[in-house]
Amino acid sequence: MTIADNKKAFFDYFIEERFEAGIVLEGWEVKAIRAGRVQIKEGYVVVRDAEMFLIGAHISPLQSASTHVNPDPVRTRKLLLKADEIKKLIGKVEQRGYTLVPLNLHYTRGRVKCEIGLGKGKKLFDKRETEKQRDWQREKSRIMKGGSKE
């Protein structure tokens, strides 16, 4: 079940590979995610010392958060992947033009997981082409549905 999608990632990048990663979360963050108070549109993934971190994902704390915990909505969160996956991703990211972006947050067997994508940035003309294709698909479905009302 999907919790949050990053539609902007598909508009800005050609996604070549996808990986599922666990996330190290605090208790209040899990509660907030279950309540749907998460946004990953501004998020990105970085590699530091052979570890992966999710930066810029915003998890809004609930009003009922504990008083002894000081919630930080945009803190850096560690991603959990297998060592061989991390090595593979480090090799790819060091190549020119590749980056790691969070694609969505979802549940797998009751745990919150983050799907990350290895993407190559789109140029402006690629984005325009994607927009034209989307408009054409929409227009095609209108025509097939019953024509335009003019």
UniProtKB/Swiss-Prot annotation:
GO MF term set: RNA binding
Signal peptide start and end residues: none
Disordered, as annotated region: 129-150
InterPro entries assigned to the protein according to its UniProt record, in alphabetical order: SmpB, SsrA-bd_prot, SsrA-bd_prot_CS
Keyword field: Cytoplasm, RNA-binding
Pfam family, one: SmpB
Protein location: Cytoplasm
Positions in coiled-coil regions: none
Keyword Cytoplasm: yes
GO biological processes: trans-translation
A GO CC annotation given for this chain: cytosol
PROSITE patterns xrefs: SSRP (PS01317)
Record family assignment: Belongs to the SmpB family.
Matches recorded under NCBIfam families: PRK05422.1 (NF003843), smpB (TIGR00086)
Family matches, as PANTHER family: SSRA-BINDING PROTEIN, TMRNA-BINDING COMPONENT OF TRANS-TRANSLATION TAGGING COMPLEX
Role according to the record: Required for rescue of stalled ribosomes mediated by trans-translation. Binds to transfer-messenger RNA (tmRNA), required for stable association of tmRNA with ribosomes. tmRNA and SmpB together mimic tRNA shape, replacing the anticodon stem-loop with SmpB. tmRNA is encoded by the ssrA gene; the 2 termini fold to resemble tRNA(Ala) and it encodes a 'tag peptide', a short internal open reading frame. During trans-translation Ala-aminoacylated tmRNA acts like a tRNA, entering the A-site of stalled ribosomes, displacing the stalled mRNA.
Protein name: SsrA-binding protein
Organism field: Cupriavidus pinatubonensis (strain JMP 134 / LMG 1197) (Cupriavidus necator (strain JMP 134))
Gene symbol of the encoding locus: smpB
